[in-house]
Amino acid sequence: MATLLQEILTNNHEFLVNNKCTKEISKYPQKKFALLTCMDTRLVELINKALGIHRGDAKIIQNAGTSLIGEMGETVKSLLLTIYVFDIKEIFIVGHYDCGVALTSSKDILHNMRSRGVSEQQLKLIEKDFQVWLDPYTDPAKNVLTVIKKLKANPFIPNDIPIHGLIIDPHTGKLDLLEDGYKEI
């Protein structure tokens, strides 16, 4: 029985044989926008198709719950890189309905970590971080609007960057507009 790693390497070999990527694509996004969205498995391929994004169009940042924790967390740093190095001109925040993060609590994940052998001493070090991150998140649409508010308040995000908020149905790909960033500029 092949392992998942072997399957992936075989798929890559077949991809290289059958798909000649001869066109050089710039690392600078052609449509000059960044997309922050969730890492949910149902969004793989779906979000690109639903938004009409093709290889080379955008900088895509994915994390659990389309999260933004702290003024200078990793997600913000990634967005700043897209603005100041890769010259993006717009940001799209796209959450999704039925988000697993909204159904998870710090208590749940800490319990699961404990059952997998993480010591109480180690859990105490991260408990507050998980409470701050997971416990307030109960509504994906509200989260998108909160992320936009935090980005607009961030002194390092230029005021001339429209920040749009949408939410996608992970089953159909239908987008609902939550905030039109053009109306804010």
Feature locations, PLM:
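Divalent-metal-activated hydrolytic enzyme cores
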Residues: A2-K31, T66-E74, Y84-F86, V101-I185
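Ordered, amphipathic secondary-structure segments that act as subunit-interaction surfaces
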Residues: Y84-H96
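Gly/Ser/Thr-rich loops at beta-strand to alpha-helix junctions
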Residues: M39-R42, Y97-V101
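Conserved beta-strand-loop surface patch within small alpha/beta domains used
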Residues: N18-V76
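Structural motif
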Residues: K32-A34, A58-K59, K89-F92, H164-G165
